[in-house]
């Protein structure tokens, strides 16, 4: 800044700018520029979508031997964000747009292609009519025929609209609403009838059960008592057995008599005539033989089991038989 404002540059009197040598650069040299994708595209290599407005560091070059009205055409090189494949496109000053050249396909291009096709057909038709007068008559005949078909279709649409105009949509909706309400009312009545029938059936069943219970509670006195069936004992459920404790198994029950005690019949001792006459019985002499019953008395304990009593009874019978 100080040099521009304060100091002056010196130009010698023999200064000639044409004599200064210029740097020779190739015409197809490339520059690195920062740009955004001008349209939506899809990579042909990996199928990755690249949307419009995505920024790239692109290489820019001038297309050789392609000029439109003196305007140069530029080519740009970018790389796919996924597979790093090279994609190229160039400017189109004729249509103020860009054209895809290599590496990708342009999306949403159907409308543009259709417009280009229409322009091409129109141009070919104009070229044919320019050199062939008969072609002009044929094209006019085709146009008039197409126009008549369009008018017929338009008339059909008008008739259809008129027929639909006479239809009262409000009345149709009202009728549909009434039919729906009637159907809902009928369904509600059927539900009520079914509920009433179920309640009536339940009430009758309850009355029958009450009458049966009254009949069972008050039997008729004239009816004779039924005798028990002899085989009814087989149908009875078995009674639960009392759990026998360990001490009862070893010692025996003290409070109740065992069931086999009924089988043991205790004999009554015969009255001795000597004792009945009042004379005392003589004491046995020492060394005299005594019967087995007196030698081996079997005292009965109140807590003895039934099996021990039965064994003692059998021993007493054997001793009596031997005597």
Curated annotation (Swiss-Prot):
Biological process per Gene Ontology, one example term: generation of catalytic spliceosome for first transesterification step
Gene Ontology molecular function: metal ion binding
Basic and acidic residues compositional bias, start-end: 236-246
GO cellular component, one term: U2-type catalytic step 1 spliceosome
TM annotation in the entry: none
Any coiled-coil regions, as ranges: none
Pfam family, one: Saf4_Yju2
Claim: Ribosomal protein is one of the keywords in the record: no
Compartment(s) where it occurs, according to its Swiss-Prot or TrEMBL record: Nucleus
Residue spans of biased composition, Low complexity class: 278-290
Region (Disordered): 207-323
Residues engaged in binding Zn(2+): 43, 46, 80, 83
Predominant location category: nucleus
InterPro entries linked: Saf4/Yju2, Yju2
Keyword flag Metal-binding: yes
Residues bearing PTM Phosphoserine: 211, 213, 220, 316, 319
UniProt keyword list: Metal-binding, mRNA processing, mRNA splicing, Nucleus, Phosphoprotein, Spliceosome, Zinc
HAMAP family, per database record: YJU2 (MF_03226)
Family: Belongs to the CWC16 family. YJU2 subfamily.
UniProt function note: Part of the spliceosome which catalyzes two sequential transesterification reactions, first the excision of the non-coding intron from pre-mRNA and then the ligation of the coding exons to form the mature mRNA. Plays a role in stabilizing the structure of the spliceosome catalytic core and docking of the branch helix into the active site, producing 5'-exon and lariat intron-3'-intermediates. May protect cells from TP53-dependent apoptosis upon dsDNA break damage through association with PRP19-CD5L complex.
PANTHER family on file: SPLICING FACTOR YJU2
Subunit structure comment from the entry: Component of the spliceosome. Present in the activated B complex, the catalytically activated B* complex which catalyzes the branching, the catalytic step 1 C complex catalyzing the exon ligation, and the postcatalytic P complex containing the ligated exons (mRNA) and the excised lariat intron. Identified in the spliceosome C complex; in the complex interacts directly with PRP16.
Designated name of the protein: Splicing factor YJU2
Organism, scientific name: Homo sapiens (Human)
Gene: YJU2
């Amino acid at each position: 800044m100080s040099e521009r404002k304060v100091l002056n540059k010196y130009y010698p009197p023999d200064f000639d700018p044409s004599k200064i040598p210029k740097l020779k650069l190739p015409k197809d040299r490339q520059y690195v520029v920062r740009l955004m994708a001008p349209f939506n595209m899809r990579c042909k290599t990996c199928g990755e979508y690249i949307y419009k407005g995505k920024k790239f560091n692109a290489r820019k070059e001038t297309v050789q031997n392609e000029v439109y009205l003196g305007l140069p055409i530029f080519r740009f090189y970018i790389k796919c964000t996924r597979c790093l494949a090279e994609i190229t496109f160039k400017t189109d000053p004729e249509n103020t747009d860009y054209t895809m050249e290599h590496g990708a396909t342009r999306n949403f291009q159907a409308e543009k292609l259709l417009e280009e096709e229409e322009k091409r057909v129109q141009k070919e038709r104009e070229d044919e009519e320019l050199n062939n007068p008969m072609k002009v008559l044929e094209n006019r005949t085709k146009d008039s025929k197409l126009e008549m078909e369009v008018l017929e279709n338009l008339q059909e649409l008008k008739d259809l609209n008129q027929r639909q105009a006479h239809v009262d949509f409000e009345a149709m909706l009202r009728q549909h609403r009434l039919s729906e309400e009637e159907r809902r009312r009928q369904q509600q009545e059927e539900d009520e009838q079914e509920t009433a029938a179920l309640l009536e059936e339940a009430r009758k069943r309850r009355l029958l059960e009450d009458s049966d219970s009254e009949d069972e509670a008050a039997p008729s006195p004239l009816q004779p008592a039924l005798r028990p069936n002899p085989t009814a004992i087989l149908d009875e459920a078995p009674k639960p057995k009392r759990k026998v404790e360990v001490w009862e198994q070893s010692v025996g029950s003290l409070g109740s008599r065992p069931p086999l005690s009924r089988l043991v019949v205790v004999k009554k001792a015969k009255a001795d005539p000597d004792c009945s006459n009042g004379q005392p019985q003589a004491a046995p002499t020492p060394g005299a033989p005594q019967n087995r019953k007196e030698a081996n008395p079997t005292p009965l304990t109140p807590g003895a089991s039934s099996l021990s009593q039965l064994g003692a009874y059998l021993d007493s019978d054997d001793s009596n038989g031997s005597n």
